């Protein structure tokens, strides 16, 4: 087909990309010309992915001392026992690195570097929920929070909603998926607003979107710099002190392999155990049970107020997942994983 005769066709152009890496780093550093990270030592986990070259460059140029791990991408080792999802499950590995090098905190990216989470000096995870709260406060104090609103998904911790209500920050909840968060932010951006505003949204996983006239999607490195900026401006001595102000509710997320995806509403034993959980946990705030859309797994989120512990929730999660497996013809003893969302780490079966 001769495209030259097609109406409405716009031709691209070839761009010499030899300096694009440097230009991106320059852009991030220039955006924070007044920010100095001197005196901070950061442990960077780059997931053997996209952040491997960029993250050490950016934080070093901003003045931080950096300790870098998992920054040797070889094509097949991306996210392999590295990066944000690994650290959420096994936080002890990064904590050992931080202790050895006496780092102030850890900064952890995923493979394509659109997500970032932190680890405070005590070894606790600072995830997307914490980051939304911290950044929401920061941008509102600066008078730059678009529509005084933060957007997140149904998987957010319940304490986040309470936190924003106490600070008169509006909260919009969407379905799970960054595309739904982005769609709500785009609606806010389309409304008349003062210049210099930032639309803030994201997910518990650490996918944070800072939307303005020049930025429209998640960028883990940019989010990380803003989070550290917010921490330094908070007056708190440690990241742990800042993150603890959010008081997250006990929350677990479980996943289990299933042989077949049978309508959960038709599984009598599953519904019976679900009703039992609701009766046994008077402080239960949310129970979300669904099949994965992409894997042969069932996923469960349990959350309760502080009358209950993470361990209590984990016990109930194992029981409900086992019931789903039994009712779907899944072999006994198949994969079940329960993640402590509140503090990080996998919870062993009791």
PLM region descriptions:
Residues 42, 107-109, 200:
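Residue-level marker for buried hydrophobic side chains located in beta-strands
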Residues 26-29, 53-60, 91-95, 99, ...:
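Predominant activation on well-ordered alpha-helical scaffold segments within soluble catalytic domains
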């Amino acid at each position: 087909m001769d495209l030259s005769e097609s109406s409405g066709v716009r031709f691209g152009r070839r761009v010499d990309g030899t300096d694009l890496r440097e230009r991106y780093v320059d852009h991030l550093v220039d955006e924070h010309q007044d920010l100095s990270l001197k005196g901070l030592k950061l442990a960077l986990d780059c997931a053997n992915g996209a952040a491997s070259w960029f993250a050490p460059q950016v934080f070093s140029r901003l003045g931080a001392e950096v300790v870098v791990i998992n920054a040797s991408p070889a094509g097949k080792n991306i996210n392999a026992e590295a990066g944000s999802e690994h650290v959420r499950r096994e936080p002890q590995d990064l904590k050992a690195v931080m202790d050895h090098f006496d780092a102030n905190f850890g900064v952890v990216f995923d493979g394509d570097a659109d997500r970032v989470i932190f680890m405070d000096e005590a070894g606790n995870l600072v995830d997307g929920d914490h980051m939304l709260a911290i950044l929401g406060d920061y941008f509102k104090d600066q008078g730059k929070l678009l529509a005084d609103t933060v957007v997140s998904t149904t998987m957010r911790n319940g304490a986040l909603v309470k936190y924003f209500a106490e600070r008169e920050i509006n909260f919009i909840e969407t379905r799970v998926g960054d595309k739904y968060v982005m769609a709500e932010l785009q609606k806010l951006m389309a409304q008349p607003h003062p210049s210099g505003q930032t639309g803030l949204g994201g997910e518990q996983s650490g996918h944070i979107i800072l939307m303005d006239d020049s930025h429209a999607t998640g960028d883990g490195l940019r989010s990380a710099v803003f989070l550290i900026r917010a921490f330094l401006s908070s007056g708190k001595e440690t990241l742990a002190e800042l993150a603890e102000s959010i008081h997250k509710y006990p929350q677990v997320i479980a996943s289990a392999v299933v042989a077949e995806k049978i309508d959960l509403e038709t599984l009598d034993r599953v519904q019976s155990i679900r009703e039992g959980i609701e009766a046994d946990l008077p402080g239960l705030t949310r129970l979300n049970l669904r099949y994965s859309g992409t894997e042969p797994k069932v996923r469960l989120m349990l959350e309760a107020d502080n009358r209950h512990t993470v361990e209590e929730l984990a016990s109930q999660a194992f029981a409900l997942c086992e019931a789903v497996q039994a009712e779907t013809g899944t072999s006994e003893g198949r994969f079940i994983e329960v993640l402590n969302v509140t503090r990080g780490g996998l919870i062993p079966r009791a």
